[in-house]
Amino acid sequence: GEFTRLMMEETGATGPWAGFNVMLAANMLREAAAMTTQISGEIIPSDKPGTLAMAIRQPAGVCLGIAPWNAPVILGTRALAMPLACGNTVVLKASEMCPGTHRLIGQVLVEIGRAS
């Protein structure tokens, strides 16, 4: 597809290697999506009688992802997948050597309503 073609053009990767990277990136996204059902808080026994302590998991806020040029699809996706799944905002610093690949990742996120 388009990710494979762009990775081949921008990095000089072979078709099979680029396709493998796209497959790995898709698997990372599936794994991150599955993790969203497992993010929860905990109730912890307290030293004080009659009370409970709670640990609440919440987003960290704004995260920075730095995506290098050598494997832009998989490394760009890795920088985004888990932070987004945990409810964070992510700013991706894309490599100037492969802007098309990282731009396409952003376009896909906009299309599915996960970025603006």
What kind of region is each of these model predictions?
Residues 1-51:
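N-terminal Rossmann-like NAD(P)+-binding subdomain of aldehyde/semialdehyde dehydrogenases
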